[in-house]
Amino acid sequence: MQFYNSLIEGILVKRYKRFLTDVTLLNGEEVVAHCPNTGAMIGCAEPGMQVWLSPSNNPKRKLGYTWELGVTHQGHWIGINTNNANKIVAEALATHAIQELQGYETVRPEVRFGHENSRIDFLLSSSDKKDCYVEVKSVTLLEEGQGYFPDAKTVRGQKHLRELAAMVEQGYRAVLLFCVQHSGIQSVKIAEHIDPKYAQMFKHAVDVGVEVLAYSCAINEQNITLNQRLPMIV
């Protein structure tokens, strides 16, 4: 996934009210940028971090910048914008870069499904395969060398697990794909210490046949691409 506009470098001053960040640009100007990440962002929003913003010329927007990338004080690259995870995976599906999801004739994004009126991130279809429902989650939480999801309690995530498990029970294929946007994460584990209910539902989903994949990303100020499969600690 390429950034169409050149990103603007700066230094993070602070993140506040979940969706706002103060950033000092390299020319000394201080701007307020939109933070497109609703999670706790533990370790991903430390003052003094090097950050990159995407500019917007849309006059209807209140804020002229969006926070896209960061580099931790330990030197790890992070994809801040969780909306990019679906774009990264969409590109990987289009180029057949995910070995476990190859061989499907069509890829449809944002398809309604299930009894709870959810939207699945991707529905893969083929005349010789059963439909495959793919839900994408962005992972950025690193604690003591281990990557975790979620970084905050997620009722929405619990709903997605219920729906994926239900699709498997109806005879379809369902995949939960963790898009790891943190260069320091080498494996992914469910954060039972943060959301025990999600961990319980995740175990049930795996038990009934929901498949789980975790992939790292190669991140720089020009683009983010899905890179290689990571161990998923279940």
From Swiss-Prot:
Coiled-coil ranges from the UniProt annotation: none
CDD domains, per the entry: SfsA-like_bacterial
Gene Ontology terms, MF aspect: DNA binding
Gene3D superfamilies hit by this protein: 2.40.50.580, 3.40.1350.60
Pfam families, per the entry: SfsA, SfsA_N
NCBIfam families: sfsA (TIGR00230)
Family statement drawn from the similarity comment of this UniProt entry: Belongs to the SfsA family.
Identification of the protein by name: Sugar fermentation stimulation protein homolog
Biological classification of the source: Bacteria, Pseudomonadati, Pseudomonadota, Gammaproteobacteria, Alteromonadales
Annotated gene: sfsA
